[in-house]
A protein has these predicted regions:
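Arg/Lys-rich, positively charged N-terminal/basic patches that mediate binding to nucleic acids
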Residues: 1-37
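Generic alpha-helical structural context detector
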Residues: 20, 40-43, 86
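Basic/aromatic recognition patch in beta-strand/loop cores that engages polyanionic ligands
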Residues: 40, 50-82
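Short proline/glycine- and basic residue-enriched helix-capping loop/turn segments at helix->loop/beta transitions
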Residues: 46-47
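Enriched for short, Lys/Arg-rich terminal
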Residues: 75-103
């Protein structure tokens, strides 16, 4: 976790699943590299940098960024760390899973 974002329980579980899957299929070195890229992507999005897409039409304040093969969704907060709500693979049914996560 970084000072500029907090992984909510669902996003933390998503990240653990990504780590397990990547380690199983591509090994430890690739896992470290991929997770480091994801962390940089999350930090940039939380700081309002990079190619962040405004998803407020779906949920107030929601932001999304694509990082490698995953979409990361977060809710920026005033004077508090951004809340990362989900990290979904590009082949998942993003909107259905996101709707479940934002309930």
């Amino acid at each position: 976790m970084s000072a500029n974002y907090t992984l909510l329980a669902g996003a933390e579980e998503d990240l653990r699943d990504i780590i397990r899957y990547t380690r199983k299929h591509w090994g430890t070195a690739q896992t470290r590299s991929y997770v480091a890229k994801m962390q940089r992507g999350i930090e940039a999005m939380a700081a309002g940098q990079g190619l962040v897409r405004d998803m407020s039409a779906l949920y107030p304040g929601l932001r999304m960024v694509k990082c490698e093969h995953h979409y990361i969704f977060c809710l920026p907060q005033n004077d508090a760390p951004a809340l990362v709500v989900a990290i979904f693979h590009e082949k998942m049914n993003l909107m259905t899973r996101l709707a479940d996560r934002l309930k």
